[in-house]
Amino acid sequence: MSSDSFQPPRPALSGVSGYRRFVASVVFAAPLLALIALWEVIVRTFDVNPRVFPDVESVVRTGLETIQDGTLIRHIGASLGRVAVGTSLAIAVSIPLGVAMGLSRGVSSFLTPLFRFFSVLAGIAWIPIATLWFGYGFGAITFVIFNAVFFVVAYNTLLGVSSIPLPLRRAAASLGASGWTMLTQVILPGALPNIVTGVRTGLGFAWRGLIAAEMIATNVGLGYMLFLARDFYRTEVIVFGMIVIGIIWLVLDRLLLAPLERATIERWGMVVRT
């Protein structure tokens, strides 16, 4: 038997990986727990007026009440539904347009100045005109989310397509790739890491635009919950809503978007798994 045929057993890494995940979780949670402890100490020590800032117990109690009566679930469902629709529409339009801009110098030259102009407008800047065009409700909020995502994803798609080396395209063409094959086997896989990064960034903008739009243009959603609580001086509801908004985004980003971006870069990008 040759020495090349012998494969020494690899050490089990499941325990090491589990320990690393545990350490990462502790490192992530420690600052949050410290912030909560500091919050409680300040409120108790200085006897802060609950209308100015509530204590931890009041926020927890309010949170449990909104969960039990179904209010929180209703607001979360409305907000997530709007984000899903607005983001999906933006992705469906922005990726083809970004690919077209990346493949055609003429299209890119014509549209790039428009992209630079509109990309500096924050999603919330569209709220006034969105309510004029679509009224108060789903249409206006979806339009705000669409604009928050569209330009980011389109621009990142353009960067991804433009970054594909020309020799790679020529090599694929010399092997007979053209048209649909070139697009699906070379262009899109090469641009995918940038596209996923754009989607991740755009969703962050969409989430912020959503909350702002819901404060003005609807009567259900997490943003509306915060705005309504403000009218009744319910600071405990406001703080709880802010915590929920942050938790939802962290869950989406850490459990869905970040792993997707990492896997995409490892599969089609310029890095390897270590």
Language-model region placement:
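Transmembrane alpha-helical segments of polytopic membrane transport and secretion proteins
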Residues: M1-P31, R254-T274
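Periplasmic/extracellular loop-to-transmembrane helix junction in inner-membrane transport proteins
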Residues: P8-R21, T45-L89
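Alpha-helical membrane-protein architecture signal
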Residues: V60, D69, I73, G77, ...
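Transmembrane-helix boundary motif in ABC transporter permease subunits
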Residues: V85-F115
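Generic hydrophobic transmembrane alpha-helix motif, especially the helices
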Residues: R116-V152, N156-G160
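Transmembrane alpha-helices
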Residues: F143, N147, W180-A213, E236, ...
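Short cytoplasmic-facing helical segments at TM-TM junctions of multi-pass membrane proteins
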Residues: N156-V199, L222, L226
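Hydrophobic alpha-helical transmembrane segments of polytopic membrane proteins
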Residues: L222-L260
